[in-house]
Curated annotation (Swiss-Prot):
<dbReference type="InterPro" id="IPR003437">
    <property type="entry name" value="GcvP"/>
</dbReference>
<dbReference type="GO" id="GO:0030170">
    <property type="term" value="F:pyridoxal phosphate binding"/>
</dbReference>
<dbReference type="GO" id="GO:0016594">
    <property type="term" value="F:glycine binding"/>
</dbReference>
<keyword id="KW-0663">Pyridoxal phosphate</keyword>
<dbReference type="InterPro" id="IPR015421">
    <property type="entry name" value="PyrdxlP-dep_Trfase_major"/>
</dbReference>
<comment type="function">
    <text>The glycine cleavage system catalyzes the degradation of glycine. The P protein binds the alpha-amino group of glycine through its pyridoxal phosphate cofactor; CO(2) is released and the remaining methylamine moiety is then transferred to the lipoamide cofactor of the H protein.</text>
</comment>
<feature type="modified residue" description="N6-(pyridoxal phosphate)lysine">
    <location>
        <position position="708"/>
    </location>
</feature>
<dbReference type="Pfam" id="PF21478">
    <property type="entry name" value="GcvP2_C"/>
</dbReference>
<dbReference type="Pfam" id="PF02347">
    <property type="entry name" value="GDC-P"/>
</dbReference>
<dbReference type="InterPro" id="IPR015424">
    <property type="entry name" value="PyrdxlP-dep_Trfase"/>
</dbReference>
<keyword id="KW-0560">Oxidoreductase</keyword>
<dbReference type="InterPro" id="IPR049315">
    <property type="entry name" value="GDC-P_N"/>
</dbReference>
<dbReference type="GO" id="GO:0004375">
    <property type="term" value="F:glycine dehydrogenase (decarboxylating) activity"/>
</dbReference>
<dbReference type="GO" id="GO:0005829">
    <property type="term" value="C:cytosol"/>
</dbReference>
<dbReference type="InterPro" id="IPR015422">
    <property type="entry name" value="PyrdxlP-dep_Trfase_small"/>
</dbReference>
<dbReference type="GO" id="GO:0005960">
    <property type="term" value="C:glycine cleavage complex"/>
</dbReference>
<dbReference type="GO" id="GO:0019464">
    <property type="term" value="P:glycine decarboxylation via glycine cleavage system"/>
</dbReference>
Amino acid sequence: MTQTLSQLENSGAFIERHIGPDAAQQQEMLNAVGAQSLNALTGQIVPKDIQLATPPQVGAPATEYAALAELKAIASRNKRFTSYIGMGYTAVQLPPVILRNMLENPGWYTAYTPYQPEVSQGRLEALLNFQQVTLDLTGLDMASASLLDEATAAAEAMAMAKRVSKLKNANRFFVASDVHPQTLDVVRTRAETFGFEVIVDDAQKVLDHQDVFGVLLQQVGTTGEIHDYTALISELKSRKIVVSVAADIMALVLLTAPGKQGADIVFGSAQRFGVPMGYGGPHAAFFAAKDEYKRSMPGRIIGVSKDAAGNTALRMAMQTREQHIRREKANSNICTSQVLLANIASLYAVYHGPVGLKRIANRIHRLTDILAAGLQQKGLKLRHAHYFDTLCVEVADKAGVLARAEAAEINLRSDILNAVGITLDETTTRENVMQLFSVLLGDNHGLDIDTLDKDVAHDSRSIQPAMLRDDEILTHPVFNRYHSETEMMRYMHSLERKDLALNQAMIPLGSCTMKLNAAAEMIPITWSEFAELHPFCPPEQAEGYQQMIAQLADWLVKLTGYDAVCMQPNSGAQGEYAGLLAIRHYHESRNEGHRDICLIPASAHGTNPASAHMAGMQVVVVACDKNGNIDLADLRAKAEQAGDNLSCIMVTYPSTHGVYEETIREVCEVVHQFGGQVYLDGANMNAQVGITSPGFIGADVSHLNLHKTFCIPHGGGGPGMGPIGVKAHLAPFVPGHSVVQIEGMLTRQGAVSAAPFGSASILPISWMYIRMMGAEGLKKASQVAILNANYIASRLQDAFPVLYTGRDGRVAHECILDIRPLKEETGISELDIAKRLIDYGFHAPTMSFPVAGTLMVEPTESESKVELDRFIDAMLAIRAEIDQVKAGVWPLEDNPLVNAPHIQSELVAEWAHPYSREVAVFPAGVADKYWPTVKRLDDVYGDRNLFCSCVPISEYQ
């Protein structure tokens, strides 16, 4: 049969690439669940009153090649000037071996946060290396495995300083006047909700101020001056004031460690260690503190523990500090951080080692000395005598200098009164320095690099002798071994092989949406047009970014039913915080600032109450009924009780129990009736796109997890993006920025992220996804996600009861399997099942959330029926194994479940178990076997014997 050209062109080809089950598989699954079609299934499950009559108009789908060409044309509108702006962002040289083997490798970027350490030892080791780099450079005792960015880390440092302060009545936080402006911006935003007063003054005047609980200093000021704060820190410590220091990671290679000078907390951006600027992110922040404060630290911390065989193994330590356990009492609302970026930085340090890093840092400093000498020789004055890589140059004809810079396609820092700022980096060359001489002095300057190099003293005094590092760094063997590309490639591959990512198997984590991160979506993030822009470059140089962001925002507006989208939050947790701040400021604008009660269902993710607390709200829990739905009577009672103090409700939809609640519109109406706003958590947006929308349901604000629904990969625990969609009345209250005016946003609010558009360089991933799927594909993706979840639920419900269902016994895009009856009957727990799944080659589902003793499964639309059946077969086989325990064939204390996972060495070890080696290690057959490298971890040992730095190589032997 002849096909038309339009049919043969097949613009929707990517839809079939993204969605796992083909048409025949979809029909088989529809038959299995008793539905005639995807539309019929959706019609049964989603409440009629919230179903969209027509899908959002986001255009027709495009092929991978057409979408890439279209985005390339947009990217080409960005102008790549050489940037010397600095302010915490510099150009880098990402080693190609790391680019190819990590950043472009799905074995690294598709993994999940390492909650299951047995399948995460590779990236845990890389993160432990990151912590070791942080410890060596900061001179402190305890380091975290990354925070979202430097400015966020500063806000976390302030919050932590208050938590550990012995000055309980003090309520003021002092910030030195030469911190980066974006850092001050985010600190002020956070301080407002905590009720802290922020004082900004010259650091030497800090002692003039009373009732100060904490101080933030910057070792190398924003205009380049190196400060020796040793005496000041000593005086502050004598007054029991907690001292935080912002530091430059490359400068720390040469400068004395702030921890050695007495600082309590040290943080900064690790961007300079190989991570492109990317118009603001994503980048990992480093964060370190004294050992005595470890239980008050924010973010993930990797610790050394033992496995069941007594072997050294790594895990996330001290999780009881975190939001998923402590909820509103958590140290921070941080969930995902920046694991992929932290690992790039850690491997940059491994590849270069201490010798290589010192060479890079010394070369940057040498070029800065040469530039300084030439400028001074020609009569220009430097504002600071002590510097590392940044000069603040006083110029008489500033306009002329900036005009010459623009003509030469150079960006200088221009916001300093009567001066310009110049920050050099590892990409700076001799030719660049000569070009800078021409810009600042004119073409006839007569200077010569070689002559200046000879003239400049080799014992340069531009770094104070007292500020030069006198201790060794990175002495651990891991930083002194892998310096050839062959060794580095093999080391990275050895780490990758230890982990389980989407390139090996389905990751059925409920509430996490581990869907395909297509290669075509990932390709643009490494394009130089996107990767090399400074976030504070003039807007006319970022027209491509602005067009791409505006187009993506327009699509998200249509998909969410909101009126505006703010792209600044660079994680879901930060999106929650930004959305709640918008609600808070909206109430204040109406003289209703007293509204501070946030209603949160008992089933909510721990980030919700933690974010509400950070936004200065009181959390009141709303009960759920026996079916897992919000108890409307209790909601009405709590709303009535809150009265004029009701600020909002935070609700997830579909619910965290995996069902479309029939009364969601009524929930919104009750809250609105009492003057509150509705925050609809976008964590489960993958079951809404094209079918319904938060705005249509009646919500006022949501964050969107672009790293879930819109295909940004999880990266082993970050990056993420959490933009917020808002109704028009909240649009004036979304985050703004003190350095860059965000076009189209009338907001005057403070920032929540260091960069105006958060992690802008990963936004092309979501742009590509929406462009290639189109309206038709996006709706179908949601429908197939629902089909896949219902297929699993229907196949497993006789073996593992599905805890919550909606109408007709259906679930949404995920289902909760109740393990509690089996545990009572047999003693086998959800943990045992999770670990046994590793032997079958699967990452575990989400354990004990939102209900203890359960497993929550979310297959996503990207998994084929073949993979779903493989998972189902594994679960049914595990159920048969549990029956063997129940029947007494295997004792409860010695069976394949409680001993799981099994490792390769057990094949040749002594064997005294009542089951065979084959049952232990090959339960699903020998084909394509995944081997964990450690047995089940001893969590208690790890927290009782906390050790969070690199261990001797002998420990792994």
